[in-house]
Amino acid sequence: MTKKIEDLILYKDEHYFSSFPSIVLLENNTLLLLFRRARDSRWLLDAEDEESLLIKQQVDHVDSRSQITKIFFNTDLQAISEPEALTINPEAADQDASLLMLSNKTLLLSSFSWYPVHSRVAGALQKKGVSLYGHPDVTGCFYISWGGFTRQSHDMGKTWSAHDYLPVLPNTRDIIPEKRGRHGGATRGQAIEVGNEVLLPVYAPLKNDKVSCSHLLVSNDAGVSWQYRSIIARDQEQKLSLNEPSLLQLEDDKIMAFLRNTSGNDHLITTISNDRGKTWEDWQERKVIGHPTHPLKLKDGRIFICYGYRHEPFGIRGHLIDSSGTNFIGEEIIIRDDGFCGDVGYPWSVQLANGNVLVVYYFTENDGIRHIAGTVLDIE
């Protein structure tokens, strides 16, 4: 049985749209929280009329100045540092943060970025076949998906290396024809370390595909350089985009991937590899509804997954799975069901020193302020 101990607000500021968190337990049992922070001009709206309420519900996931922000917490889950933005990318806007502590005590951050494009050059770029996202009337400008990158910290998150873009994915369309390839696609999900390899999941469409698929990159030097290994999952029928993959090591070289089913019925997709991702079994649609999924192996060997639930009632949910990744255990865990709108989710979990599990996520309550929240669970 799972018992909720408490809900927490970890960071909330009406001037910012805070979202897409990741968290890691450091050596001294303190916690490092990273999340995307962007400007949010909705704080200027004082009215509670119908139009203002609709604006507060609107999704706004791109901003030309979005940044990855860090906060350190103690074992009592109290902030012990002020929010501080990591050094920014001077040419593009940083998005989701995904963290991994390596065995050599290096912190690996993977993320991706959007390149802002002025409206006066948008038409010419589109004629060249460049795919643009957004519109100045809605998102302030146009954007180009600029690729995935990694950064490293060798001092427990105090300082970080520069943005290092991932290699170009094979058999994918250039972001800018003959000028910029698709560097790693996008990343949102858990990387893992297996033996002497770091396995990093990413996602991007193949050159002739209509939908996106998930790919695996591998590093043999603790995340300094990367090579392409395989396609994790792809819909041969070209109906489902299989995105935002997260990895979990089951045992030895056996790993499991958890994927978002973007253009289908929002059911969780999973697949297993028995050789560190060189080959993958056929992917399966599971009974869980929600996205994206973060998997956590508990100290007793069971797997705890958490995911956003963007259907009424909006919130955060979870489930237990046996150690093989095959069978779901018990009933679905309702972590939160009081969201103001569907703009919630992207949870990440960590087991604390006392055995409890902390789930962090972004959330929206009736005031419309997107913030980073957390829930502490006692999982028996």
Task: State what each model feature region is.
Residues 1-380:
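Asp-box/BNR beta-propeller blade signature and adjacent active/binding-site loops
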